[in-house]
UniProtKB/Swiss-Prot annotation:
One GO term of the biological process aspect: tRNA 5'-leader removal
Gene that encodes it: rnpA
Record Gene3D superfamilies: 3.30.230.10
Family: Belongs to the RnpA family.
NCBIfam families: rnpA
Keywords associated with the record: Endonuclease, Hydrolase, Nuclease, RNA-binding, tRNA processing
Catalytic activity annotation: Endonucleolytic cleavage of RNA, removing 5'-extranucleotides from tRNA precursor
Matches recorded under SUPFAM superfamilies: Ribosomal protein S5 domain 2-like (SSF54211)
Organism in which the protein naturally occurs: Clostridium acetobutylicum (strain ATCC 824 / DSM 792 / JCM 1419 / IAM 19013 / LMG 5710 / NBRC 13948 / NRRL B-527 / VKM B-1787 / 2291 / W)
Top-level taxon: Bacteria
Enzyme class: hydrolase
Name the record gives this protein: Ribonuclease P protein component
Length: 119
């Protein structure tokens, strides 16, 4: 998954400016269709200093990344995602973050439904 990350500032800006946003209480999701890399999804995670000290921010990033990793096989391919953590993420459990991410991907219409992964 490390090679499927958005790292450059210009890539983040493109997703912010041209992408579509979806939000809930814990997270904000920006989605941009990537016409060059059609067979993979890329993800960028942003957690501001408002969320907490570095230990808290790192934990939130790890929880978001792990939740995405476990659910990425159920998503349509060829998109860039930027997930922004809101201050309400501070102190939340993994299950709360995972439910929030699933909710956002459902709102965006990016979940592939089949018999195995009905949520």
């Amino acid at each position: 998954m490390k090679e499927n990350r958005i790292r450059k500032n210009a890539e983040f800006r493109r997703v912010y400016r041209k992408g579509k946003s979806f939000s809930n209480r814990l997270l904000v999701l920006y989605v941009y269709k990537n016409y060059i890399l059609k067979d993979i999804n890329r993800i960028g995670i942003s957690v501001s200093k408002k969320v907490g000290k570095s230990v808290v921010r790192s934990r939130v990033k790890r929880l978001i990344g792990e939740s995405y990793r476990l659910n990425s096989s159920n998503l349509k391919k060829g998109h860039d995602f930027v997930i922004i953590a809101r201050t309400a993420c501070n102190g939340k459990r993994y299950s709360d973050i995972e439910d929030s991410i699933k909710n956002l991907f459902n709102k965006a219409g990016l979940v592939i439904y089949d018999e195995k992964n009905i949520t």
